[in-house]
Amino acid sequence: MGSDLNITKQLQDYILKYGLKLHPIQKEIINHNLSLGDIKRMQISISQCQFLHLIIKVSKIRKVLEIGTFTGLSTLSMSLALPDEGEIIALDKDKKTNKIAINFFKKANQNHKIKTIIKPALESLIKIRNEKFDLVFI
C-alpha cells in the first residue's frame, strides 16, 4: 500500500475501527491487489482513501483529475464522495490495469462519473489543458 506520514499502528487501527467504512468494492480492489506482488505498492492506503473521501465531501468538489489510476482504488474512493453529477477524469497508460479498474467502477455503479483515458499523461494533459478541475490527484 501507499506510504503514510507518521501514522502509527495504533492510529491506523483507530482509523479502521472508527473511520469511514469501506465500500465492498473498495475491499474487493484491496484484496485483488494483494495478489499482484510488489506492484501493489502503487495502491493508496485505507487511511488515504478515507482522507480523500473527507476532503472531497467537505470541500464540495465536483470535478477531479487523477493522474495514475492503477486498479482504481483511489478513483473509486473519490467517486464515492462526489455528488451524482460529479466527474473524474482518470489518466493511465496501462491498458491491463485500466480494464481491471473499469470493471470495479461498473461493479460499484460509479462508471457514470468516471472517464478513463489510456495514454501517457503528458499527451492527455495537452488534450484537456483547457478544462478546469476542483482537485488534481497524482
Describe each region flagged by the PLM.
Residues 1-135:
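A short alpha-helical cap/connector motif
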